[in-house]
């Protein structure tokens, strides 16, 4: 099972997209994020395995079965924790770059 520190920004992006657009296909998600369909499939399967996302079948307008991706309550909590982790990481990177720039100006 993945630890909260092992999730990637792609996992986080996918959780946000699924929360707002549960009927999107993996292909559409991949196009929106600019990553491969295989990567999206891998991330979604990982999120399903840890219980952050559930899959439900639905019948779409073309008489085919599709999936609805549902962010679980556990997934909603994890999404906030992962987002906070990335925010802290980005803040640290910003401060490091800021210090490099100001040190080189001195």
Task: Annotate the PLM regions.
Residues 2-11, 25, 56-80:
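Short, cationic-aromatic polyanion-contact patches
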Residues 12-16:
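Pre-recognition alpha-helix immediately N-terminal to the DNA-recognition helix
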Residues 27, 38:
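Key DNA-contact positions within bacterial/archaeal DNA-binding proteins
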Residues 31, 48-49:
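Alpha-helical residues within the helix-turn-helix
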Residues 77-106:
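Amphipathic alpha-helical dimerization/coiled-coil segments
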